[in-house]
């Protein structure tokens, strides 16, 4: 068949298929690739669905069919008020965020997952060539959307405690000197970063917020893994230190802590929120009413009793992976997550190509992970702290693996990681 001869949008040539989406075609025994939730509060969902079904039947038999019709209809673009109230209460009580008990719910915006929030935020903030500061490595679902909107990425290296505010400050100054303009925003995952697994200590959280305020940048805090903290102290999010809510764009999601309902709940400065609501109206009109209602019942009735079981499940999976890496991998360096889904491991040899090894050795042996180079910008710059220069991002490291412990059972994780370690030792010897 011959279709119309038209040219597709330029971004389709700039950005290849997501590496994680690409790897889904492989069916393997040992799956350490995408961060698929494997510990879900399964006992809650039959009760939630039963509760909603009984409520709907009662409405139908009482002649209030219109109430049921509304459950499967369009709703407000910014989310159902009753759902926003539940989320506001949780963020106030669990995160220590300053939200008015009576009116604070109006600041909450519901999106169809955090990924939609990312897309909408960048859609309303970025013009071509606008600069964005991100960690290195960085969540590819954020950085590639920046590229889609023709933004310029500046990736700033961190350490085992996440982003280093001093480096971010210097990178901003260097960008101003080089390009004659400051970046628009900083992106960070403060709790159990994806892909590195690092968690920022409180002093760095405060310092990073100070940098954003001093330089006049928005700070996008992606808190997808906030409730999946199974070791150490539970720290306040950066948004809790932004008392007037003028700087931090705070994103949370049900996907990791409940299930992949595609319900995100967000706080944004008022001027950003209004533009994002407008953009969402043109994007999907509203987040499905029925999934919002499922989330509402879960957080109201089941969240406290199930979240500890969820955390414990992920802790056991993390421990199985960490133990097997420490005992069976070749010499290298790994992060030590306090939560989240991922461990980041770097081979001792800088010339090791983790993508080549994946294709030629790991996949044929039934093992799947995501090569580390997938988490560096396709286009843009990497800040070098030693020289203070911004260098081309195309020369990103190739010797890292992102290993997910979220999906497989602990005994399968241990077995698969020991097998991967044996393959790595043989390959690197």
For the regions a language model picked out, list residue spans one by one:
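N-terminal small-domain helix-loop-helix segment of the aminotransferase-like
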Residues: 5-6, 11-113, 120, 300-304, ...
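Helix C-cap/helix->beta junction micro-motif
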Residues: 30, 149, 214-215, 365, ...
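Conserved glycine-rich beta-strand-loop-beta hairpin in the small C-terminal domain of fold type I
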Residues: 39-41, 296, 312-322, 333-347, ...
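Conserved core of the PLP fold type I
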Residues: 67-215, 226-245, 314, 411
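PLP-dependent enzyme catalytic core of the Aspartate aminotransferase-like
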Residues: 89, 382-429
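Glycine-centered flexible beta-alpha turn that most often forms the glycine-rich phosphate-binding loop
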Residues: 222
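Conserved core segment of the aminotransferase class I/II
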Residues: 243-315, 323
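Conserved PLP-binding catalytic core of the aspartate aminotransferase-like
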Residues: 331-366, 381
